[in-house]
Amino acid sequence: MQVSDLFIREMPSDCLPRERLLAIGEKALSNQELLAILLRTGSKEADVMTVAATLLKQFKQLSYLQQATLNELMAIKGIGQVKAIELRAAIELGCRIYQSSQIKFGKVTSSQQVAQRLLQEMKGLQQEHLICIYLNTKNDIIQQKTIFKGSLNQSIAHPREIFREAVKYSSARILLAHNHPSGNPTPSPQDIQFTKRMEECGEMMGIQLLDHIILGDSGYISLREENFFASE
């Protein structure tokens, strides 16, 4: 018996997803196999494929896994701090790659177009995220940034932070969007007040606020389309 034959037969199952990726490519692998590759090894209680399956069962959807905290990941048997950090880093990198591919050379043609993209991008977020999209005079996207995470009710969002970036990018226009974790996109009095304040600041600086979009679970509300802008 050849030593190499013995090694192949006794190769741990942990290695199989990597071998399959080499043989057939990453697109043919299941979510469980891709997670197993990121995790690399299992534990004494469970092999890596079992740990990956437990992750998928625990969070049910990849969009829920995207929002998993370090502590939530570490609550899974077989995932320690190092593995949790590596998973969070991989997830964040994937989000940034997706976001970059969506905004590069893009053009804003309507609030609906922006809302449809952001609904997918911000799905499952447990906190309010305020997004600002910076545009040139032709409505080409220059940059997209998350201004803050929290709640507009807490008065965290300050026009200074938003317009400082607008000046930095030489933006002619901006478009704001934020999600309602409750799933209901109906604007609150604070949302309306914040929008009017941003519109006034934009007028003083010569930077137009095109719209403020509020995102729910499966729909959105455009404050401009709903006539909440003073310029309407």
UniProtKB/Swiss-Prot annotation:
Keyword Lipid metabolism included in the entry's annotation: no
Residues that, per the record, bind Zn(2+): H178, H180, D191
UniProt xrefs under CDD domains: MPN_DUF2466 (cd08071)
Protein name as it appears in the record: UPF0758 protein EF_2926
Domain MPN: 107-229
Signal peptide: none
Example GO biological process: proteolysis
PANTHER family given in the database record: DNA REPAIR PROTEIN RADC, UPF0758 PROTEIN YEES-RELATED
SUPFAM superfamilies (alphabetical): RuvA domain 2-like (SSF47781)
GO MF annotation: an example: metal ion binding
Keywords: Hydrolase, Metal-binding, Metalloprotease, Protease, Zinc
